Swiss-Prot record:
Cross-referenced InterPro entries: Ribosomal_Su5_D2-typ_SF, Ribosomal_uS9, Ribosomal_uS9_bac/plastid, Ribosomal_uS9_CS, Ribsml_uS5_D2-typ_fold_subgr
Family annotation (Gene3D superfamilies): 3.30.230.10
Protein's name according to its UniProt entry: Small ribosomal subunit protein uS9
Keyword Ribonucleoprotein in record: yes
Biological source species: Clostridium beijerinckii (strain ATCC 51743 / NCIMB 8052)
Signal peptide extent: none
Amino acid sequence: MAKVQYMGTGRRKKSVARVRLVPGSGKVLVNKREIENFFGLETLRVIVNQPLVLTGTKDRFDVLVNVHGGGFTGQAGAIRHGIARALVKSDEALKPELKKAGFLTRDPRMKERKKYGLKAARRAPQFSKR
């Protein structure tokens, strides 16, 4: 018999996370590493676990994540987005709760491009009157 698993893809900035929810005890593996070893900061671990804590499904699923691109904050946001989408596939009744919390919305904020004549996206060279 085939294993029951729920897939979800999350994105944030340049990061893409492919998330699999498998019935289990609440383990979170990111790129085959424990979440404690992957994310050094506690705040990033909290961000990743938010959808599971909100819906009360922390102990029902093992979370297997493959994430690439971007930095740590972008990756944490992408994982949260992917977990939320996978939870909706597992139980449609969770959708209003997750939508209200904003976990199903793809954060559209991206890095602004550098403009010519400037040092960065908005940072101008120092102005000298004389």
